[in-house]
Amino acid sequence: MEMWFSELHTSNVKLSMRIEEQLCSVESDCQRIDVLVSDEFGKFLALDGEILFSEKDEFIYDEMVTHIPMAVHPDVKNVLIIGGADGGVARELINYKCIERIDVVEPDEMLVEVCRKHFPELTCGLDDDRVNVYIQDALRFLRNKTGDYDLIINDATDPFGYTEGLFTKEFYGSCYKALKSDGIMVYIYQLVHQAIGCLDLLPRNIIRLMISDRRNGRS
């Protein structure tokens, strides 16, 4: 009997792929975690029924969110990755000898463990001596940070469920405070067909923050 995995994009559209094997299916305190194998994409990770990444194409995301800001900023030494349980972004960052510290803040410890077991080619990035992994809520972590980071990469998942707090005005304000004056922040913004429930949320919060900071004399 064939096994298929389907990811709903809208009520009328879904992506389906034939599954060769299911390697893992567990429930953490935060979400359901599945690792499956397909002929088309190899191993892939799904959280609450939505594909996070696959062996075939994860490099596209990890390289884009890493190397573009690194090419723009002249002197990155301290980096914060919010999320990043799979280690893919950290794996790209450790190639830069100028970086002195990489803090990875991920609330779901089980997700880190699953990724270490099934995606060691990615989580090797978490084993570098410069990388510190904190199993903690990112918003709480950020509240005590002021001017600590040259680069913040928001590698969290969609703005629903347990990560919803990472897509609020308070969160972006905390990120802004944690950045140095010339710091850069990179964040995920979904494709339109995936973002029906949050199209109004992210831009409004960011724009409000930018307007407030301009009025306070910081650009």
Language-model features: locations:
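Substrate-binding/catalytic lobe of Class I Rossmann-like enzymes that use SAM or dcSAM, i.e.
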Residues: 190-219
